[in-house]
Every structure is written in C-alpha cells, then in structure tokens.
C-alpha cells in the first residue's frame, strides 16, 4: 500500500504541470493578477489537459469512492447542477444520469480541450442533457439564480481568483441552492497527495464564510476527501 501511495503521489505531482497557452485565453483587461496566496494558502496551478486520462483512471472509484460522494449529494431528477472544473467528465456524465433528461448539468472548464473530451464522451454514451461552458479564471459563466447544486471536486484549491469565483458562484445559486466542496484532507498525512493540493476544514472555513456562504452540512465518510456543503448566507429554508 505504501508503494502504491508513493506512486500515486508522484503521478498527481506530474499531471498538474501547466504549459503555456493551454488555458482558455483571457481578453478582458479588467482581470487582475492572481494573488498567488489566499488567506495563508498557496494557490495551486490548474492541471493541464494532457493529464486528463488520470481523471478517469480505473483506480479512481476505488481510491475516492465517487459513488458514495454522488449519493451524498442528494440530487433529485430535474435539478440543475453545475460541475465546475469538469475536466473530461468523470463526474459530469454520472450527474447527467442522476438528474435525468428533465434536468441539466452545466459543465464548466477553462480549457477547451477538456470540454472537447467531455463532448466526445457524452456523445459516445448518448447523453444530451449536458451544457459545456468555457469559463474564465474569474467567471464560470453560470446563469444567475438558476443552479440547484454547484459541485467542486478537487478544483477549488486551483482557482487563481477565489474571491471572484465564489462571488459568481453565489450569484448562480437558487434561493435554496447548495455548493458541494470536495477537497483532499490536509489533516490526514496518509492521503497520498501533495500538500499544495490538499485543504483542511479550518482553511476552507477561512475562505467560504467571508465570501457570503454558510456551512450547512458535512459528510465525513469518503476515503480521502472532505465533503462540505454550503449555501448562501442569506439562503431561505426549504
């Protein structure tokens, strides 16, 4: 097991390398530079699309127990879900099946190549309720007040502009909408991920409440990740 963990740690450190010119180009001069460090946390770089096969590796379900994560989301048919940092669709395709044809998944990524991989995978499975969206580093381009659940799996720590992204996500939520945040546990040294790609609960709570969110639920039964649910701090009760 130790050998497997070591190999995994090496692998994840390899696939997060960013090459020039691969992230969606930004033309808005108003986009500020990334702070680099946010509330004491160094911001990680975005994973390059050449690492996409790692996202759908055979061992991912066993290592992360994605089936349990999906059950914990409590999704209903007909809901609108935004999968931000969707990559090549490991969760997107499953989400689309859960919400059914009457629901929709807005799949957001900042790399066109990732979205092309996703489109190919969706077409191969005949899934038609996915809306691919090319976002930017400050805006996931979600329709305001329309999303039931925003899913962030191992991606928030890579947001180069966390405050702008959280503000945009907050605007996209319905009055009872939720954000499901999954991040590798920084508190657990046995989780074979580089520290830069982990977050502690304490750090998460340093970042979300000041940006207009309240913690409403925690799920602690995943092998490697925290799963924390947030709503707008002014959210109405269901």
Where are these regions (language model features)?
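Class I SAM-dependent methyltransferase SAM/SAH-binding core
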Residues: 82-139
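Class I SAM-dependent transferase core
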Residues: 26-82
């Amino acid at each position: 097991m130790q050998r497997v963990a070591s190999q995994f740690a090496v692998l994840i450190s390899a696939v997060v390398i960013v090459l020039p010119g691969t992230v969606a180009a930004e033309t808005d001069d108003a986009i500020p530079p990334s702070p680099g460090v946010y509330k004491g946390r160094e911001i990680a770089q975005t994973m390059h699309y050449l690492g996409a096969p790692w996202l759908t590796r055979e061992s991912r379900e066993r290592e992360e127990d994605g089936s349990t994560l999906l059950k914990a989301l409590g999704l209903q048919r007909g809901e609108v879900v935004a999968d931000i940092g969707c990559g090549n669709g490991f969760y997107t395709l499953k989400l689309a099946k859960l919400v059914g044809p009457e629901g929709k998944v807005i799949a957001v990524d900042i790399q066109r190549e990732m979205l092309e991989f996703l489109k190919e995978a969706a077409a191969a499975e005949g899934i038609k309720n996915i809306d691919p969206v090319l976002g930017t580093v400050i805006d996931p381009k979600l329709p305001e007040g329309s999303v039931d659940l925003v899913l962030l799996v191992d991606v928030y720590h890579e947001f180069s502009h966390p405050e702008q992204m959280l503000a945009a996500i907050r605007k996209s939520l319905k009055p009872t909408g939720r954000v499901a945040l999954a991040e590798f546990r920084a508190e657990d040294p046995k989780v074979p991920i580089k520290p830069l790609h982990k977050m502690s609960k304490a750090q998460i709570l340093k970042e979300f409440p000041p940006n207009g969110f309240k913690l409403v639920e925690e799920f602690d039964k995943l092998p490697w990740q925290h799963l924390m649910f947030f709503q707008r701090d002014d959210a109405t009760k269901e």
